[in-house]
Amino acid sequence: IAISPENLKISERAVICMPYHKLLDCYEEDRLADAKYGSTRRGIAPVYGDKYMKKALRMGDLFHPETTKARLADIVAYKNLTIEGVYGRPPVSADDMWAWLVEYGDILKPYICDAGLYLDKAAKAGKNILFEAQLGALRDIDFGIYPYTSSSNVIGAYAPVGAGIPNHKIDRNIGIMKAYSSCVGEGPFTCELFGEEAEKLRAAGGEYGADRKSV
């Protein structure tokens, strides 16, 4: 299937994961050492933190380069306080971050849309809409085994919030239950299996992390 703006849409409200988010993710995991959370080191926790600190950029900002460039410079100065002061690492260049944002932003701009409006039109046209949650309920930031969770809500109740549509539009919820439990990362794991029994299930079910091929 060819990927085009006709079949792939990116919400204008989606927060952009910048290179410094990945750096901060790695620096913190390295600092924690044996007490680490088992992050994928993709910058997910730092970018969610910035979202709620109002220190993040969103996809829609790409259409306003002048204000976005100025805001990025302020954000980078703020992030460097942590990068240099806490982790003792070299500062990030605002110019480099802007060049990165422009390069990839130009590629992605055609895909950006008002996702809520797009889905509302689809619903009114009688189309079927499927929302798929990633990860299991125990990785949910609110209902999971905190702090060994993802950084967002992954349960079905959050689907209309993230999509920007009224919750009464959701007319069916489908829960998936596995015959055995599995998880990636650090932290407690209820009913964890070990030894030969675990290895057989892992191999038979392909139970490896999609990001790092972790077990």
Identify the residue ranges that each predicted region occupies:
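Non-transmembrane, aqueous-exposed alpha-helical and coiled segments at domain scale
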Residues: 1-214
